[in-house]
Amino acid sequence: DYWQDLQKLPFLSSFATYPMASMLLAAYLNKLGLFLLSQFLWYIALLLHVFLIAIFTWKYVLKAEGLSLTPSWTVLYVGLAMASLTQGVVHQPFLGYVAWFFALLLSLILYPLFYRARRSQRLPDALKPQWAIYCAPFSLLLGSYIRLAGSDAEGWFVALLLLLSQAFYLLVLCLLPRIFRLGPQLSWSALTFPLVNTAFALKLGIDYLGWTWLVWLSHAEALLAFVIVFYVCFYYTVSLRARKITKNPR
């Protein structure tokens, strides 16, 4: 069943969250002094992500009769920028920049496609929580650019990425009421990373630019992300518990 689900377009594109999370885990393991383990995990995660991009592109882009776009496409293609954010694990800035420019290019390609497809391809209700993903790409690009370039990052470009990420974040905030009115969905998990990532990127951006007058906004976005993550985790816990009780009645 799981393998059949993985063959479906929305699931296969979302599966890229696993190598992304693995690269992030590698960064934490590296901080704990587990250097060999973290580097091994990072390279395996990068190879898995590239493999998923190749399989998905071949099956759903090159061989498909038409493009069936969902927001989770950005998880797959732009999510590779996680390698840029965490390249310090393996000290490979070249790989980081290659991944970053790839993610930037795909962002510039995908967003116009999403705009064109917004009416011709209606997103099913079960996938509408993926709308939250719209704010993730430019936030991830912002955070990874600052981490990659360090003090050499161009201030105007940081500001541009910051404004773009916040613009899409505002769009997501406007869509949240429509998402929650649909009722509980398994795809609520799509609400977590984009909101956390945007709050994290905002903090990095305002720290780099010295925009201390926006600290309150950083705190507000972090608080909202915490509330959403807690709520989604609570929903999953209750749902899994209910299923367990149903299958194993006492």
Question: What are the functions of these language-model segments?
Answer:
Residues 34-50, 94-108, 155-166, 220-225:
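Structural signature of hydrophobic alpha-helical transmembrane segments
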Residues 27-39, 85-97, 145-157, 205-216:
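Helix-coil boundary and interhelical linker segments in multi-pass alpha-helical membrane proteins
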Residues 202-238:
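A generic transmembrane alpha-helix motif of multi-pass inner-membrane proteins
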Residues 2-27, 42, 60-85, 100, ...:
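Juxtamembrane helix-loop boundaries in multi-pass membrane proteins
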Residues 143-146, 150-183, 197, 204:
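Long, repeat-rich segments with strong aromatic
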Residues 52-59, 85-86, 109-118, 140-147, ...:
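Alpha-helical transmembrane segments in multipass membrane proteins, preferentially the mid-helix core
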Residues 137, 166-174, 227-233:
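Predominantly late transmembrane helices and immediately cytosolic-facing juxtamembrane segments
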